[in-house]
């Protein structure tokens, strides 16, 4: 709640989180957009799809098995959505229960598979979704993404801020 109040009052200008190793030095800016992965996929191909290129896409979902998350992210990949972004930030994908049908297929495995086919950096660890402690994100604003070792900083008090239709 504090993060939301700070964001609404204009006091919050950045959020940070930790991701895996391998993205040190990543830097870019773009329009921050996204939300629930299932909802986004349901909009694909409709007039309501947000056509954003060069953005920073964030997604989350709940109660979806890794193979289903993979299917939805591959749908966005095959539609050219992921390749058109500067980066993809994965929030929380909890709430699902292991099943014998999963055969050990985990979210970590799914992320590795996606990274193998997608040319865009895919970062995990964004504290967003159905989690007790989450960040408030300025959807639709230009943000700057910086990674130093495993620390990710998303800031929106940047010089690149401008209106987007």
Residue positions per predicted region:
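Solvent-exposed alpha-helices and their adjacent loops that cap or buttress functional pockets
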Residues: 24-25, 32, 49-51, 81-82, ...
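ATP/nucleoside-binding phosphotransfer catalytic cores, i.e., glycine-rich phosphate-binding loops
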Residues: 92-161, 165
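Pocket-edge structural micro-motifs
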Residues: 34-35, 41, 60-61, 124-126, ...
């Amino acid at each position: 709640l504090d993060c939301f109040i700070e964001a609404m009052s204009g006091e919050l200008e950045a959020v940070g989180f930790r991701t895996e190793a391998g993205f040190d030095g990543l830097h870019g800016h773009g329009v921050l957009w996204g939300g629930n992965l299932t909802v986004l996929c349901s909009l694909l191909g409709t007039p309501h799809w947000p056509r954003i290129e060069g953005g920073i896409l964030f997604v989350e979902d709940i109660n979806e098995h890794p193979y289903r998350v993979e299917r939805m992210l591959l749908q966005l990949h095959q539609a050219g959505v992921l390749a058109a972004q500067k980066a993809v930030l994965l929030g929380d994908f909890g709430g699902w229960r292991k099943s014998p049908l999963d055969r050990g297929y985990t979210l970590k495995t799914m992320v590795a598979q996606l990274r193998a086919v997608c040319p865009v950096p895919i970062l995990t660890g964004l504290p967003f979704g159905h989690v007790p402690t989450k960040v408030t994100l300025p959807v639709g604003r230009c943000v700057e993404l910086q990674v130093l070792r495993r620390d990710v900083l998303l800031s929106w008090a940047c010089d690149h801020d401008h209106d987007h239709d």
